[in-house]
């Protein structure tokens, strides 16, 4: 069609430097986000190939980390509230390069959903309250912790 546009989150690329690329492991900053819970009603696929559609950003906190070399086994992501109580956990890839895991802001282990919303009944527990959460990524012998913030939704 000739006028295509690629939309992608390049946040980790903006943070990359020569120093990071020589490290065996690096956890990038985590952008604070509110939980939106987008929903849509209707069949928007009736327009065929003439309808340009770009999906919304995922509804969750995106955790990006860099590995200089691929590691055996996956990454373990642990999310704790500010008092140190574990509220969620995820597993991630351990491939060389930038790896990405989405936390859908819900408690539990890999608890339902890829962060994309639609018009359907939600499965799993409701999202956690706004606030700061300690997010720890462990791969092989490497470990790093960052604060991830669920912001309050303001409309």
Where are the regions that the model predicts?
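Beta-strand-rich binding/interaction modules
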Residues: 61-64, 70-88, 132-136
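Beta-propeller blade termini and top-face loops
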Residues: 1-52, 58-61, 66, 70
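Primarily secretory-pathway and cell-envelope proteins
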Residues: 50-57, 69, 142-155
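Extracytoplasmic beta-rich repeat domains
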Residues: 46, 51-53, 57, 102, ...
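Glycine-centered tight-turn motifs at strand-turn-strand junctions
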Residues: 86-126
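Intrinsic-disorder/low-complexity, polar/charged segments enriched in Ser/Thr/Lys/Arg/Asp/Glu/Gln
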Residues: 58-64, 98-100, 143-145
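Hydrophobic beta-strand positions in extracellular immunoglobulin-like domains
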Residues: 65-67, 105, 139
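Short acidic/polar inter-strand loop motif in beta-rich domains
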Residues: 109-113, 139-147
């Amino acid at each position: 069609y000739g006028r295509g546009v690629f939309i992608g989150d390049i946040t980790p690329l903006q943070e990359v430097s020569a120093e990071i690329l020589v490290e065996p492991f690096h956890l990038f900053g985590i952008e604070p986000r509110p939980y939106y819970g987008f929903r849509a009603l209707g069949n928007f696929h009736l327009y065929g190939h003439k309808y340009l559609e770009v999906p919304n950003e995922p509804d969750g906190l995106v955790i990006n980390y860099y590995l200089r070399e691929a590691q055996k086994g996956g990454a373990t992501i642990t999310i704790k509230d500010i008092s140190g109580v574990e509220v969620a956990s995820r597993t991630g890839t351990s491939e060389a390069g930038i790896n990405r895991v989405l936390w859908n802001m819900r408690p539990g282990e890999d608890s339902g959903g890829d962060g994309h919303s639609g018009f359907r009944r939600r499965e799993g527990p409701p999202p956690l309250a706004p606030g700061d959460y300690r997010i720890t990524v462990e791969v092989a012998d490497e470990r790093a912790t960052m604060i991830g913030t669920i912001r309050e939704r303001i409309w």
